[in-house]
């Protein structure tokens, strides 16, 4: 779905009042009745409301539902885009929208700027659009949740959750983008001048980078959180270092974080570790071994006692960030978060297979190097189409390209299921 802001400047105050009324009515109605829209908007005349509704429908900001017993409308993704952008424009967070940086698993990424021309990144969450794993999996977890198909609401929750995670982590000194604003399903954050680690083939100090990444996983866990998607696609390598103490990377994509008290915390922690081990072994030919003769346990890899972190051995809680942001697994959630947790749970497991785990060196030798099936958070058109070493990886990449091509060319010709999910033939 492309972001089209060309009509935004022509919308009147009344148009936005009616659009916001549809949004508010959507909290209790799948299809918002026209009389309710008029009532919520506070418009003086019904004719003024009807005019605004007509204009908004022509711009596909709202849509009229067929085969319903009453005259009503529902908000579209274009409509909620406009509402979020309008809010950020009023806050002077976003002034202009630039080109698409890429298409992620459940989001679109744009380059934007503020009123002073400072470049930023705008991430638009679009849960339920099209799963990069399979459309069927998304439908499965929808049926299990029994929460309905209010993907806009889930996208809003995911964006708010990511903004909370980033704000808390940034304030604690973790290497994450600086968050600037959040409105509805959109998060605006710092633009990182760099590239995804998946493109990394040479580095001046590979052992240090490896150790720093492993320490990030442990430090995050010591603060109460596990990333759950810590891989080469969600790690940005910076073009320039700020100082000699700069580790040279920034971690992105946080909606799926869980608490270290989660019942599967050990599994997700080890999976994050294994993703880094596989990448360094496969692409950088770096595979450190444990060295019992070394006494230093402040890092991992060459020159240290341990080759990689272990959840039970290395994680020692020093902070309660999971409690502060109410991360999954810490406590019982408000009913409104259950649908989000179900959706994000599917995202966590969409492209991973438990057979790929490397709990020890023997398992690694038995299972081989493992597959690279995670998707890139930023699909850069300049990335080289590398030859895959595994047939399943080739198939996954081909599916991703097909989805991205369909999304980039528009969704007008795509069919939709009853829940509003786009289906690729």
UniProtKB/Swiss-Prot annotation:
Quaternary state and interactors: Component of a late pre-40S ribosomal particle, composed of the 40S ribosomal proteins and the non-ribosomal factors DIM1, DIM2, ENP1, HRR25, LTV1, NOB1, RIO2 and TSR1.
Main location per the UniProt record: cytoplasm
Subcellular location: Cytoplasm; Nucleus
Domain Protein kinase: 95-257
MF terms in GO: ATP binding; metal ion binding; protein kinase activity; protein serine kinase activity; protein serine/threonine kinase activity
Necessary cofactors: Mg(2+)
Other remarks in the entry: Present with 10300 molecules/cell in log phase SD medium.
Organism the protein comes from: Saccharomyces cerevisiae (strain ATCC 204508 / S288c)
Gene Ontology BP term (one): positive regulation of RNA import into nucleus
Keywords: ATP-binding, Cytoplasm, Kinase, Magnesium, Metal-binding, Nucleotide-binding, Nucleus, Phosphoprotein, Ribosome biogenesis, Serine/threonine-protein kinase, Transferase
Catalytic site positions: 229 (proton acceptor)
Pfam families attached to this UniProt entry: RIO1, Rio2_N
InterPro entries: Kinase-like_dom_sf, Rio2, RIO2_wHTH_N, RIO_dom, RIO_kinase, WH-like_DNA-bd_sf, WH_DNA-bd_sf
UniProt-listed Enzyme Commission number(s): 2.7.11.1
Start-end of Acidic residues biased regions: 354-400
Result for mutant: residue 186 to V: In RIO2-1; nuclear export of ribosomal 40S subunits impaired
Binding site for ATP: 123
UniProt KW Ubl conjugation keyword: no
Stated name of the protein: Serine/threonine-protein kinase RIO2
GO cellular component term, pick one: cytoplasmic stress granule
The record's account of how the chain is modified after translation: Autophosphorylated.
UniProt keyword annotation of Phosphoprotein present: yes
Family of this protein: Belongs to the protein kinase superfamily. RIO-type Ser/Thr kinase family.
Catalytic activity: L-seryl-[protein] + ATP = O-phospho-L-seryl-[protein] + ADP + H(+); L-threonyl-[protein] + ATP = O-phospho-L-threonyl-[protein] + ADP + H(+)
């Amino acid at each position: 779905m492309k972001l089209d802001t060309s009509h935004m400047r022509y919308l009147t105050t009344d148009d936005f009042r009616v659009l916001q009324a549809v949004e508010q009515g959507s909290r209790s109605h799948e299809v918002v009745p026209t009389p309710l829209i008029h009532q919520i908007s506070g418009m003086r005349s019904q004719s003024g409301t009807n005019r605004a509704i007509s204009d908004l429908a022509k711009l596909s900001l709202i849509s009229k539902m067929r085969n319903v017993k009453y005259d009503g409308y529902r908000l579209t993704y274009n409509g909620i885009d406009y509402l979020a952008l309008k809010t950020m424009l009023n806050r002077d967070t976003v002034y202009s929208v630039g080109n698409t940086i890429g298409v992620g698993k459940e989001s679109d990424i744009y380059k934007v700027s503020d009123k002073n021309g400072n470049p930023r990144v705008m991430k638009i969450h679009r849960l339920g659009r099209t799963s990069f794993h399979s459309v069927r999996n998304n439908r499965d977890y929808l049926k299990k949740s029994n929460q309905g198909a209010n993907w806009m609401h889930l996208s809003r929750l995911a964006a708010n959750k990511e903004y909370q995670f980033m704000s808390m982590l940034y304030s604690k000194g973790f290497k994450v983008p600086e968050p600037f604003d959040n409105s509805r399903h959109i998060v605006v954050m710092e633009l990182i001048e760099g590239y995804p680690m998946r493109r990394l083939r040479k580095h001046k100090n590979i052992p240090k980078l490896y150790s720093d990444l492993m320490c990030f996983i442990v430090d995050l866990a010591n603060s109460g959180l596990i990333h759950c998607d810590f891989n080469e696609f969600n790690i940005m390598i910076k073009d320039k270092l700020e100082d000699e103490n700069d580790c040279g990377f920034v971690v992105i994509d946080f909606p799926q974080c869980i608490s270290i008290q989660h019942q599967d915390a050990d599994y997700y922690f080890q999976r994050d570790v294994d993703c880094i081990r596989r990448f360094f072994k496969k692409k950088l030919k770096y595979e450190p071994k444990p060295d019992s003769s070394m006494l230093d346990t402040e890092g991992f890899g060459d020159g240290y006692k341990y080759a990689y972190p272990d959840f039970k051995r290395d994680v020692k809680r020093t902070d309660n960030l999971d409690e502060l942001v109410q991360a999954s697994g810490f406590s019982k959630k408000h009913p409104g978060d259950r649908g989000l947790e179900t959706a994000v749970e599917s995202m966590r497991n969409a492209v991973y297979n438990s057979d790929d785990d490397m709990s020890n060196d023997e398992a690694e030798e038995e299972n081989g190097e493992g597959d690279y099936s995670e998707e890139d958070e930023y699909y850069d058109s300049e990335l080289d189409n590398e030859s895959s070493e595994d047939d399943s990886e080739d198939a996954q990449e081909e599916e991703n390209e097909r989805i991205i091509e369909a999304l980039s060319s528009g969704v007008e010709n795509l069919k939709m299921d009853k829940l509003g999910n786009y289906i690729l033939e």
